[in-house]
């Protein structure tokens, strides 16, 4: 049986994934750590918007900020998140196989 802690953890993940930009950040960080400006450019959002999304993801415990001199880069908070995102994508594509084709994804 799920505990309140399990429920809260899944709710935090659901909140993080409920926004396309935050989902994009998680998928990008699954590949490699990145600076906020690079994430903003890659996802087509302002740096201020990216800052807000990263703050949300930090608050959810999904990403970590790593100081690097005068700059800060971000990474997934735990390597298990990378595997979880991979599995979640597999499930989505299994349940809705027609959402992605050679021209992109609609899901």
Give the role of each language-model region.
Residues 37, 41, 56, 60, ...:
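Functionally engaged cysteine thiol sites
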Residues 2, 8-46, 71-81:
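N-terminal helix-turn-helix DNA-binding core of bacterial DNA-binding proteins
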């Amino acid at each position: 049986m799920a505990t309140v802690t399990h429920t809260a953890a899944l709710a935090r993940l659901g909140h993080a994934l409920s926004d396309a930009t935050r989902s994009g950040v998680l998928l990008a960080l699954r590949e490699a750590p990145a600076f906020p400006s690079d994430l903003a450019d890659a996802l087509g959002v302002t740096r201020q918007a990216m800052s807000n999304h990263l703050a949300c993801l930090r608050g959810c415990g999904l990403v970590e900020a790593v100081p690097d001199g005068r700059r800060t880069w971000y990474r997934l908070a735990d390597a298990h998140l990378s595997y979880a995102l991979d599995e979640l994508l597999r499930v989505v594509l299994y349940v809705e196989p027609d959402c992605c084709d050679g021209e992109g994804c609609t899901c």
